[in-house]
């Protein structure tokens, strides 16, 4: 089967425990969903040169990943990276190279620290909930100073009630 023009691939919930080494046949792949499988690692050759500019969305949630292959940081157009509910104990240094990353989720892992270059990211959405982060781990996360005030949950609830009246 020739898949050279494939843009989106969803192999979620298939009990996949290993991936093939050769992903060179998917040069136009922009979205890869491998959630709810049994992956414990990713092939070192998975993020090939042909995919480095096309892949924008990766969902590896609900697997058994213990480490993240640093080759993922060569994906220059990666915008969404979902790693929720794995067994990750760290995020490798180099994540700051993902200059187009806007959504990063890694809830429900075993993360204790964040890499020093984490503060280079310009995220719109970040979820690190349910991790045993050390007290000093989130120091790389600096609040956005763009003049935007985020309302409290109480204020949002009050607005919702007011709008329903």
Residue ranges of model-derived segments:
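Repeat-solenoid scaffold signature
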Residues: 94-133
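Structural signal for repeat-unit boundaries in curved repeat scaffolds
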Residues: 3, 26, 50-53, 75, ...
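The feature encodes a structural signal of leucine-rich repeats
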Residues: 1, 19-22, 42-47, 65-71, ...
């Amino acid at each position: 089967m020739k898949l050279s023009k494939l843009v989106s691939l969803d192999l979620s919930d298939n009990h996949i425990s290993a991936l093939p080494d050769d992903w060179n046949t998917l040069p136009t792949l922009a979205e890869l969903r491998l959630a709810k499988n049994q992956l414990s690692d990713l092939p070192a050759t998975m993020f090939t040169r042909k995919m480095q500019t096309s892949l924008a969305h990766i969902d590896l949630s609900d697997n058994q990943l213990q480490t993240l292959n640093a080759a993922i940081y060569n994906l220059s157009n990666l915008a969404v990276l979902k790693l929720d509910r794995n067994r990750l104990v760290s995020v490798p240094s180099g994540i700051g190279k993902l200059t187009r990353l806007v959504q990063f989720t890694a809830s429900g892992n075993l993360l204790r620290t964040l890499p020093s270059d984490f503060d280079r990211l310009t995220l719109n959405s970040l979820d690190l909930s349910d991790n045993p982060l050390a007290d000093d781990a989130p120091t790389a996360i600096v609040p956005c100073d763009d003049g935007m005030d985020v309302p409290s949950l109480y204020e949002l609830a009050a607005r919702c009630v007011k709008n329903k009246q």
